[in-house]
From Swiss-Prot:
One of its GO terms (biological process) is excitatory postsynaptic potential. Disulfide bonds join 38-44, 39-46. The modification Leucine amide is found at residue 65. The gene is Hcrt. It comes from Rattus norvegicus. The keyword rRNA processing does not apply. Specific enzymatic cleavages at paired basic residues yield the different active peptides. Neuropeptides that play a significant role in the regulation of food intake and sleep-wakefulness, possibly by coordinating the complex behavioral and physiologic responses of these complementary homeostatic functions. A broader role in the homeostatic regulation of energy metabolism, autonomic function, hormonal balance and the regulation of body fluids, is also suggested. A modulation effect on luteinizing hormone-releasing hormone (LHRH) secretion also suggests a more minor contribution to the regulation of reproductive function. The modification Methionine amide is found at residue 96. Transmembrane segments: none annotated. GO terms for cellular component: neuronal dense core vesicle lumen; perinuclear region of cytoplasm; postsynapse; rough endoplasmic reticulum; secretory granule. This is Hypocretin neuropeptide precursor. GO terms for molecular function: neuropeptide hormone activity; type 1 orexin receptor binding; type 2 orexin receptor binding. Residues 1-32 form the signal peptide.
Length: 130
């Protein structure tokens, strides 16, 4: 079975190259999109922007973005939330250190009293009482 031969005129090929080549060359010369002001000044969360425009495997980062859970909030994160939230900022900031220390205490034993629980209950808590 013989297929009819089709010859493409050089004018059509030239026209196609003239239409497609300049945009392709221009797209190579264009720099990456500039970083938004909020990301440059670190005033907002730019995790998605960094995933899209940063180095590395973008697909893996984007696919796992929703599955990631942030680690335990540090003092810096809690201080930031206290300053940005409504309410009594001074009370929250003044008690923040005490709450951080309280989180480090071990949980009491389940069931009846264990020897460490009674020793902890009888030991005085830190700080002077005036």
């Amino acid at each position: 079975m013989n297929l009819p031969s089709t010859k493409v005129p050089w004018a059509a090929v030239t026209l196609l190259l003239l239409l497609l080549l300049p945009p392709a060359l221009l797209s190579l010369g264009v720099d990456a999109q500039p970083l938004p002001d909020c990301c440059r000044q670190k005033t907002c969360s730019c995790r998605l922007y960094e995933l899209l425009h940063g180095a590395g495997n973008h697909a893996a980062g984007i696919l796992t973005l929703g599955k990631r859970r942030p680690g335990p909030p540090g003092l810096q994160g809690r201080l930031q939330r206290l300053l940005q939230a409504n309410g009594n900022h001074a009370a929250g900031i003044l008690t923040m250190g005490r709450r951080a220390g309280a989180e480090l205490e071990p949980y009491p034993c389940p069931g009846r009293r264990c020897p460490t629980a009674t020793a902890t209950a009888l030991a005085p808590r830190g700080g002077s009482r005036v």
